């Protein structure tokens, strides 16, 4: 058992001493046998999950296979080997994913589980115990959960059979710890899965027959003249769904860059005797509603269908087949597609990517197992769907079949392509022109403002020390920003409940960075815990005499509306009105902008973001935390902090002592109450 690429197949081969397991990722359980060290060994390899994806994000078929795996070696396995790579850091997200998937088997499975570390050769002279102690608490939690049973395997060194003999001994010890018993799953859980699987397979067969008949009926109504010499296609879907790869597969060459684009891309090519135009629209976050997406993204989705005039023959809605599709994804997808009007669904085909992960499983089995949200989507699209394996470009039959399905879609629409309401398109184009004009003006204003400030600054005003507080909602990118500023991994990416202080030398300055804990993005200050509010107030006192700037962190790839603005305003107001004069808005995820200027994003996003920038004296900066080697973005940020100090007559921010004393007093009182409660508990227990 384990995540993808952990080394399950290689481990199975090492145990059996020969190549029995295919190194391709299986979609179903694989069973193999062999004689090892005078024992008959049966090994079941369960399919793996994506390492950082919670169990809720995994497809239903995968979850069923995990449950079924322990029934394939009756009466049950003597041990479950939980495979983890020793050369990869084990993070909280990995622990949560692993825990969720193993919990499908019930709580008792942990008593029969051994953690098996692969890539043991990477340890060199380091012992596995040293590695475990050097890792954070998540790995230690896992080992505690498994009764501290673990083993290291070097799959590259097959000749060393002592490591396999020792592993088999540890499995026997595990059985002894369980009073000689193997693991047995609750029969009720297993029976339910088997019954559900049978029903799904029946429905999948019926679906295959229905789809075949539907296609035959459409083809019989089409004449030879309805074979198109030109096809216009729009690719739509969430980020990382595989839009660019699909575009490249359709055109048969690398035309689309696999980087996420902020704007629509248009490419052409000759495919199967047709001139094909493909438009790739930028994607949204898979479980973010349309209200949470930036306005620029929504504008691009609307524009996409106008870039292949007179309109696309089909919209291909891209979904990964190796990731679960639930209500959140369905709502996000529905909201974004509805921007194009209700009529777009008549021209839409669902295109499943990562088809290679299905192997011997039919797409119909996947659909029937996944549940009502995916079925709703297919019904909405007139049950038009196709599976693509973007890794197998040489198989051009999958593309020919897709183009035929697009022609069938046109036939279902009486020979018509999709055309967006001209009024909607015209209004959007006019709005975009006005935004671009305002963006140009803003850029000039900001440039002039900075030049004026710099002209007032003398060389003596270049500060040798800078004190910075990072403030913002959870997942905004505060820790990553702190690491980018200091040029190294100083802040843990886990959410912290308390302020964290770090120091470093950057661009000939001594920098102190305080990271304050974040609030929930849409939650007003009244709903935040008192401890969080206290930490926000205390943050500015942790770099005495006070910070030169407060960096207010906001993600540029997420919409900023009234709820976010109110939450942010409420939390920052805890520090008093004067804090706004020392605040700079720092946009993270700058890489998602690409060729779009930050000014265009600001002008398109609307009044709430503009209110915030006005409140901060129009001080802002964009950071791409993925590009650490570009130190110009950090140097420019430090210059903007110095300019902020100049705007404040050389003064740093200092919180009203009364606010600080009140907060400090409340914190001390809470600590005293907690101590009293602890004392009472200890006396009661005695």
Predicted regions and their residues:
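C-terminal non-catalytic interaction/localization modules
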Residues: 1-43, 48-61, 72-76, 89-114, ...
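Glycine-rich, N-terminal phosphate-binding loop of Rossmann-like dinucleotide-binding domains
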Residues: 84-85, 319-320, 554-555
């Amino acid at each position: 058992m384990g995540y993808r690429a952990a080394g399950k197949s290689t481990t199975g081969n090492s145990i059996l001493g020969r190549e029995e397991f295919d190194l391709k990722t299986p979609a179903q359980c694989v069973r193999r046998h062999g004689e090892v060290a005078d024992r008959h060994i049966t090994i079941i390899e369960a399919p793996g999950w994506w390492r950082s994806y919670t169990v809720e994000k995994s497809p239903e078929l995968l979850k069923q296979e995990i449950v079924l795996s322990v029934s394939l070696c009756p009466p049950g396995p003597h041990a479950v080997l939980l495979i983890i790579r020793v050369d990869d850091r084990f993070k909280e997200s990995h622990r949560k994913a692993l825990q969720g998937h193993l919990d499908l088997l019930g709580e008792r499975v942990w008593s029969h589980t051994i953690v098996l570390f692969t890539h043991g050769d990477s340890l060199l002279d380091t012992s596995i115990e040293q590695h475990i102690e050097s890792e954070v608490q998540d790995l230690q939690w896992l080992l505690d959960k498994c009764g501290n049973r673990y083993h290291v395997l070097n799959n590259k060194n097959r000749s060393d059979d002592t490591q396999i003999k020792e592993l088999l001994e540890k499995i026997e010890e595990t059985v002894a710890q369980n009073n000689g018993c193997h693991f047995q799953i609750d029969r009720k859980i297993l029976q339910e899965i088997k019954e559900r699987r049978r029903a799904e397979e029946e429905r999948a067969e019926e679906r295959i027959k229905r789809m075949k008949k539907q296609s035959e009926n459409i083809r019989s109504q089409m004449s030879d003249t309805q074979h198109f010499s030109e096809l216009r296609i729009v690719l739509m879907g969430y980020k990382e769904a595989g839009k660019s790869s699909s575009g490249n597969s359709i055109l048969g060459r690398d035309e689309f860059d696999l980087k996420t684009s902020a704007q629509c891309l248009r490419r052409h090519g000759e495919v199967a005797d047709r001139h094909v135009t493909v438009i790739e629209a930028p994607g949204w976050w898979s479980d973010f509603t349309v209200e949470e997406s930036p306005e620029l993204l929504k504008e691009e989705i609307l524009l996409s269908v106008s870039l292949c005039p007179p309109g696309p023959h089909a919209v291909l809605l891209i979904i990964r087949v190796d990731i679960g599709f639930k209500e959140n994804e369905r709502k996000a997808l529905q909201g974004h597609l509805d921007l194009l009007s209700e009529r777009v669904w008549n021209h839409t085909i669902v295109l499943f990517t990562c088809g290679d992960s299905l192997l011997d499983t039919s797409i119909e089995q996947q659909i029937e197992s996944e549940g009502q949200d995916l079925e709703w989507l297919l019904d909405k699209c007139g049950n038009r769907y196709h599976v693509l394996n973007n890794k197998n470009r040489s198989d051009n039959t999958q593309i020919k079949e897709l183009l035929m399905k697009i022609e069938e879609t046109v036939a279902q629409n009486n020979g018509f392509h999709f055309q967006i309401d001209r009024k909607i398109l015209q209004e959007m184009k006019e709005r975009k022109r006005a935004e671009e004009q305002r963006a140009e003006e803003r850029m000039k204003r900001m440039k002039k403002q900075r030049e004026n400030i710099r002209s007032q600054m003398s060389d003596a005003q270049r500060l040798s020390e800078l004190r910075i507080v990072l403030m913002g909602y959870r997942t905004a990118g505060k820790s990553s920003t702190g690491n980018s500023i200091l040029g190294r991994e100083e802040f843990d990416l886990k959410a912290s409940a308390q302020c964290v202080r770090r120091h470093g030398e950057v661009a000939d300055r001594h920098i102190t960075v305080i990271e304050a804990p974040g609030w929930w993005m849409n939650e007003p200050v009244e709903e935040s815990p008192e401890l969080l509010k206290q930490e926000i107030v205390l943050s500015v006192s942790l770099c005495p005499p006070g910070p030169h700037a407060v960096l207010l962190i906001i993600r540029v790839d997420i919409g900023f509306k009234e709820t976010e603005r109110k939450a942010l305003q409420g939390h920052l107001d805890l520090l008093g009105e004067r804090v706004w004069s020392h605040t700079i808005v720092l946009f993270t995820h700058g890489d998602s902008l690409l060729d779009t200027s930050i000014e265009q994003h600001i002008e398109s996003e609307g009044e709430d973001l503009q209110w915030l920038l006005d409140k901060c004296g129009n001080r802002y900066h964009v950071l791409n935390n993925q590009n650490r080697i570009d130190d110009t973005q950090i140097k420019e940020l430090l210059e903007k902090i110095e300019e902020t100090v100049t705007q404040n007559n050389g003064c740093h921010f200092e919180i009203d002592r009364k606010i600080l004393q009140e907060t400090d007093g409340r914190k001390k009182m809470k600590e005293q109450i907690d101590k009293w409660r602890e004392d009472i508990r200890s006396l009661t227990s005695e």
